[in-house]
A protein has these predicted regions:
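Conserved phosphate/anionic-ligand binding catalytic regions in large, soluble enzymes, centered on
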Residues: 7-12, 144-165, 264-276, 435-447, ...
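Flexible inter-domain linker/hinge segments
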Residues: 84-145, 305-320
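C-terminal accessory/binding modules appended to enzymatic or scaffolding proteins
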Residues: 334-346, 352-354, 358, 516-560, ...
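Ferredoxin-type iron-sulfur electron-transfer modules in oxidoreductases and energy-metabolism complexes
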Residues: 1, 16-36, 53-78, 126-143, ...
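Gly-rich Lys/Arg/Thr-decorated short loops/hinges at beta-loop-alpha junctions or inter-strand turns
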Residues: 110, 115-125, 175-189, 292-298, ...
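Iron-sulfur cluster-binding cysteine motifs and their immediate structural context
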Residues: 47-51, 444-450, 538-557, 568-581
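Short amphipathic, charge-patterned alpha-helical segments
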Residues: 203-205, 354-370
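Hydrophobic alpha-helical positions that pack around
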Residues: 228-354, 366
């Protein structure tokens, strides 16, 4: 048997490395082998251990602890019931069962550090097919047939960008992978690089062949050390096997590849800002035109796509563009990967065909909302996206339908919110992020987001004024019309969508000085119900501000002047005696 421990960043953070070490100490007692894999996407169940027998998955064990190693060894030694208590439930199996995986097809299956495991799953066969039987024009046509659009957020046709770079005059051309995944709560690209780096390399090589580039660069944020480490090893192995470098596969095509670690600036997700950073300059967007296809890296013709876009390419070449186009909707083909996070039961990586609804993802795959709470909204597209309310849960997931709601597909962030989430505070959070991440080049983004944030800060503190909502809307449209790049133009989206769908919450904050979600501390008042209080003194002992007084077995009181509204009393009271209004 083969024991496989999931060691993506999520698994390691949950303790997978310790689980691996515990099993390693005992594995000698069996005839089994022990290896690692990347993230299969079920982050809510990490650490995960899979047990294979003859290539067939026999057991998937979840939330495994180091002390469970003895159970695992007992199972592989013949005790069929040894791991029953840590085996995945039938309900949680639905998380993967209801997905369609193309970009993530190898994630959590192969060892990302061993190239032979990738080639065993048809790895580099697409590259071989391209070099042996297809011209660059053939490749671009196949991508056109597939309908593959850029998965970084803009949804621009991939074939069009490749063709523009192909047609540009110049001896030197560059292919660049944008792995600068900066959206809060997004981890799709990180998982692909950590779990299936050779798929990224193969997709990039096919793209380089198509546009005529002899050098490829992966721009990845420095905050992804494991992804960088595994990608470096994958590049080294690909070079040793003749899949990368000079005269690839003996077919006369040469392309070298290197990694550039970025400093983590959100604006460097914008392609021209990324290029500036690659050149050693401050990451600030360039004016377009010219576009990178005409004048990009070092002012040479360049093509930029993100990780997920490249991760689809080898599958399309092997299976045909028509097979990819058969999935999805008329305007949005294929599958899309989402990072499902927030107040959700089953959070992790989800890949579904375009055309599924938000309800399909959040409730059928994600299992619905934690702790019996009600679904309130979902934030799509990160800081550049928008909030979609519960009555639009049946919105189809494609570029046009999501755009009609005021949100965007984005790179794939999907943050789920329940009834305890304040939408004004949510807008404040995302605007605070974009204001800090603004490169400062244009006034609309640099100053406009700051003024908007000042208004939101006042509102959540109970200092909102009549006319603030209208002023926010005016600033939003001014920034959208005047900002230079996509970051600035989309920065107002979280504010606009929360005003559109949750205007009543803004009005409650401004007019009534109340937070309907009971989330904004400055608008809350803590009191103790004398009839329910048992005088156990636990709340008084836990209060960091010494704001609670009272005798043992007598009703306690909260001093409003001292109360810092931290919520400690609510969390420790076993009798529901603390009221929050």
């Amino acid at each position: 048997m083969k024991i496989v421990v999931g060691e993506g960043s999520c698994g390691i953070a949950a303790g997978a490395a310790k689980v691996y070490s515990a099993i390693e100490k005992l594995i000698g007692l069996t005839g089994s082998t022990l290896t690692v894999t990347g993230c299969i996407g079920m982050c809510f169940l990490e650490p995960i251990v899979d047990i294979y027998d003859g290539g067939e998955l026999k057991k998937r064990l979840v939330k495994v602890r180091p002390e469970d190693a003895e159970k695992i060894i007992a199972y592989v030694n013949g005790d069929e019931n040894a791991v029953n208590d840590i085996e995945i439930s039938d309900e949680d199996k639905l998380f993967l069962k209801k997905q369609t995986r193309i970009a993530l097809r190898h994630c959590g299956i192969i060892n990302p550090e061993i190239i032979d495991e990738y080639t065993a799953f048809d790895g580099y066969r697409a590259l071989e097919k391209v070099l042996k039987t297809m011209t660059p024009e053939d490749v671009i046509e196949e991508i056109k047939i597939s309908g593959l659009a850029g998965r970084g957020g803009a949804g621009f046709p991939t074939w069009f960008k490749w063709n523009a770079a192909r047609q540009s005059q110049g001896e030197t051309k560059y292919l660049i992978c944008n792995a600068d995944e900066g959206d809060p709560g997004a981890f799709m690209d990180r998982a692909v690089i950590e779990s299936d780096p050779h798929n990224l390399i193969e997709g990039m090589l096919i793209g380089a062949y198509a546009i005529g580039a002899k050098e490829a660069v992966v721009y990845v944020r420095a905050e992804y050390p494991l992804a960088i480490e595994r990608l470096k090893e994958a590049i080294k192995q690909a070079e040793e096997k003749g899949f990368l470098g000079e005269n690839i596969m003996g077919m006369g095509f040469s392309c070298k590849m290197r990694i550039k670690a970025g400093a983590g600036a959100f604006v460097c997700g914008e392609e021209t800002a990324l290029i500036e950073s690659l050149q050693g300059e401050r990451g600030m967007p360039r004016l377009k035109p010219p576009f990178p296809a005409q004048s990009g890296y070092w002012y040479k013709p360049s093509n930029i796509n993100n990780v997920e876009t490249f991760a689809n390419v080898s599958w399309i070449i092997l299976n045909g563009g028509e097979a990819f186009a058969a999935m999805g909707t008329d305007g949005s083909k294929g599958t899309k990967v989402f990072a499902l996070t927030g107040k959700i039961k089953r959070g992790g990586l989800v890949e579904i065909p375009m055309g599924k609804t938000l309800r399909d993802v959040i409730f059928d795959i994600g299992g619905g909302i934690k702790n019996g709470k009600k679904f309130k909204a979902v934030q799509m597209g990160g800081p550049s996206g928008g909030c979609i309310p519960a009555d639009l849960l049946d919105t189809v997931i494609d570029y046009k339908a999501l755009g009609a709601t005021g949100a965007i597909m984005g790179s794939g962030g999907m943050v789920v919110m329940d009834e305890t989430t304040c939408m004004v505070s949510m807008a404040q959070f995302f605007l605070d992020f974009t204001a800090k991440e603004s490169c400062g080049k244009c006034i609309h983004c640099r100053i406009g987001t700051k003024r908007m944030l000042e208004i939101l800060n006042r509102i959540v503190k109970g200092e909102g004024r009549e006319g603030d909502i209208e002023l926010l809307e005016e600033l939003c449209y001014s920034i959208k019309d005047g900002a230079l790049c996509g970051l600035g133009q989309t920065a107002p989206n979280p504010v606009l969508t929360t005003i559109k769908y949750f205007r009543n919450e803004y009005e409650a904050h401004i007019n009534d000085k109340k937070c309907p979600a009971k989330s904004c501390p400055d608008l809350l008042e803590y009191t103790i119900d004398a009839d329910k209080c048992r005088g156990c003194t636990l709340c008084a002992k836990k209060c960091p501000a010494n704001a609670i007084s009272g005798e043992v077995k007598s009703a306690h009181k909260i001093d409003r002047d001292k109360c810092i509204k931290c919520g400690s009393c609510v969390s420790v009271c076993r009798f529901g005696a603390v009221n929050v209004d």
